[in-house]
Structures are given as C-alpha cells and as structure tokens.
Design a protein with these regions (language model features):
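Conserved Nudix-box catalytic region and its N-terminal flanking loop in Nudix hydrolases
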Residues: 2, 51-93
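Short metal-coordination and nucleic-acid-contact micro-motifs, chiefly zinc-binding Cys/His arrays
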Residues: 5-9, 26, 43
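Short cysteine-rich clusters marking metal-coordination/redox-active sites
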Residues: 12-15, 30-33
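Short functional micro-motifs and their immediate structural scaffolds
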Residues: 20-21, 38
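Short linker/helix segments within small regulatory modules
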Residues: 21-27
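Conserved N-terminal beta-strand and adjoining loop/helix that marks the start
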Residues: 32-56, 76
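Active-site-adjacent beta-strand/loop module that shapes the phosphate/pyrophosphate-binding cleft
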Residues: 106-134
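NUDIX/MutT-family hydrolases
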Residues: 137-167
Length: 178
C-alpha cells in the first residue's frame, strides 16, 4: 500500500521489471533501471455561490464517493484547461448556470477515494456570482441542490472533508466580519 490507497503499479512502465515501488519521498522508483515516476495532486475547483439571502448553494452528489451527501459545486480541472475555465464549465454542466464574476479565495487539500484508488487533489475555491439563479437545474454529477445558511448547515451531511473544511473557513471568516 501507498498514499494512493492501493498498489498503483505492478511493473515498471519503462523496463517492465517487478521492482517498481513507492518511496518515502513521494514517488515511484524502479530498483532495477532507476526510472522515477512522480504522481502529483490533481487540481479541482469549488464554487461558493450565494442567493439574495446570503445562503450558500450546496449540491447533492449523484455518484460515489459520498453519493447523496452535500457538496459544493465544482469538479476536476481537465488537462490543458485553466482553473477559471474549469470553474465556468463545471458550473454550467452541473447546474446550468453562467458565471459572471469570480474571485479566488483559498485552496484546500483533499483525498478523493474512487474505484479503489485515492486521488490527492488540491481544491481551488472561488467566490462566484451568476447571471441568473432562476436558470438553475441539477444535471451531470448533481442530483439536487439546496441553499443553506453556512452557519446552519450540518457538516455531518457534507460528504468530503475538504468541503467541510471550506465551510468551517467560511463560518470563521464571516464571524470575524461581524
């Protein structure tokens, strides 16, 4: 086992030997040919979208991990895509909403278990406004949505640790502004 929740490689992709092991220095190395493979974090985006009551838009996950639990809208950044483009694409795909403004807030590391493998992600969090909330429609990876006051949401209903951490951050920053 390694940091990914499974044995990632059985054989070295360069020489084919069975000596391809995960090192304590966070990469895979073949003890036969010396090939090194670095498996870095994947980037993901998260949107904080509020309604006129300042409630935060939470989605309901339609797939595992954490199927049926609360999440914040967003998703993985595709290869060759900017975080900003991924943010706009994911919000359109999941909720049929068009972003008209966004502001970077913070990052949050995450472990995303899927298919027997643990993906390490870095979630880039943005405060967003949309052109028209009336166009909202759950789609793609989202089975539903709810607007909830960030101070009233039960963090036990949130499926991913990084999202719970983001909610805690929002609570703390809003409390300090009062």
């Amino acid at each position: 086992m390694d940091d990914f929740g499974c044995k990632f490689f059985d054989f070295c992709p360069q020489c084919g030997k069975e000596q391809f092991l995960y090192t304590k220095r966070k990469y895979f190395q073949c003890s036969d040919c010396g090939f090194e493979f670095f498996f870095n974090m994947s980037a993901a985006v998260v949107a904080i979208i509020r309604n006129e009551k300042n409630e935060v838009l939470f989605t309901i996950r339609s797939h595992n991990p954490a199927k049926g639990m609360l999440d914040l809208p967003g998703g993985f950044v595709d290869t060759g895509e900017t975080a900003e483009h991924a943010l706009m694409r994911e919000i359109k795909e999941e909720l049929n909403l068009n972003l008209c403004n966004y502001q970077y807030i913070k990052t949050s590391p995450n472990e995303y278990p899927y298919g027997g493998f643990t993906y390490h992600t870095l979630d880039l969090v943005f405060e967003c406004t949309v052109s028209n909330l009336k166009e909202i429609k759950a789609d793609d990876d989202v089975s539903g949505y709810r607007f909830i006051n960030v101070h009233e949401v039960n963090t036990g209903d949130i499926g991913l640790e990084s999202i719970r951490n983001i909610v805690t951050y929002l609570r703390e920053t809003e409390k300090s502004k009062r």
